[in-house]
């Protein structure tokens, strides 16, 4: 993905490398390219990045993905912010995690990353995330940790599959107003979003070919060469 981004013309210093499983060769590629930072999901991953960065004589900027234990009103299989999900580090472990990070001379802590799920249509879920982020920032500051430059709130804003023609454009206004109202950023902090589906979901067209028409007693089906739906 990093290679694909750069081949498409995106500057390496605007790329953030996320994902729960980063192979050594991918970490090396990212460090050589000079990406903006890594979203780190665990202490073992941090240790691997630190080891590779030291061997390469590089400094890796990292942001920690937090599991805020916030549920989302979406399908159970695409929630990512609950305690039982595989993603991120528990909030209660963050002070110790950041202090562990400071022990590595080739690692620089730059921010916090969150993502509570996909295809979310209720703004209450994003409001709950904001309140958890505020709680975490207060907790870190109480421990003297103030070097949080970036806050990445992930994405998750869904599109209306029930009435796609009537609501072709998601309610971006309500989405951004939720963060503007409820998220308490500190001076100089940068806020990052990972909007994907909401931006491009309605922008494509499926090009397919009719192979044949199948008739049954109750329905008529067009069989196409683009899948089984």
Give the predicted meaning of each segment.
Residues 118-229:
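C-terminal active-site-proximal or functional interface alpha/beta core segments in diverse enzymes
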